[in-house]
């Protein structure tokens, strides 16, 4: 049951912490990016089932593309095995105690390279974060092209 929602700011990690401070009396916390309007009830159910088993879960999909890691000079440094590469979506779901511990730990550190809440949990607690399948339609709308894709989803 959702107790309350908060409007975001410029830095999502600070927003997550603000949300954690508002919902102290809960067992699990679901952190969702408002730029992903196509999250489904089925995705939520899979994520909640996984977090109950593991304590930390991110939604995502196996990458359909080959991914290259680059060096600082713009050359390919490494090509990870595609079978091990997932593109991560939201929601990200955690036990309240775990995500709160992670955020409390990082508060006084440089957060400029933090990309999501799972990264905070990984770095600050060492906890494993499980993967749960999302949907290729659970896209993040950040560019005009994304909006075109979203409109196409709505037409079908």
Mark where each language-model region is.
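Single conserved hydrophobic/aromatic residue that forms the stacking wall/gate
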Residues: 1-8, 12-13
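Short secondary-structure boundary/capping segments
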Residues: 3-4, 20-21, 48-49, 76-78, ...
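A residue-level structural signature of the nucleotidyltransferase/glycosyltransferase Rossmann-like core
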Residues: 4, 36, 56-58, 77, ...
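A general structural signal for well-ordered alpha-helical segments in protein cores
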Residues: 13-16, 31, 44, 60, ...
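Conserved beta-loop-beta/alpha segment of the NTase-like Rossmann-fold superfamily
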Residues: 14-72, 89
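Residues that scaffold the ATP/ADP-binding catalytic core of kinase and kinase-like folds
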Residues: 27, 69-70, 79, 102, ...
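Short, flexible, basic/aromatic active-site loop/helix in glycosyltransferases
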Residues: 68-94
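Conserved alpha/beta core of the MobA/IspD/sugar-nucleotide pyrophosphorylase nucleotidyltransferase superfamily
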Residues: 85-156
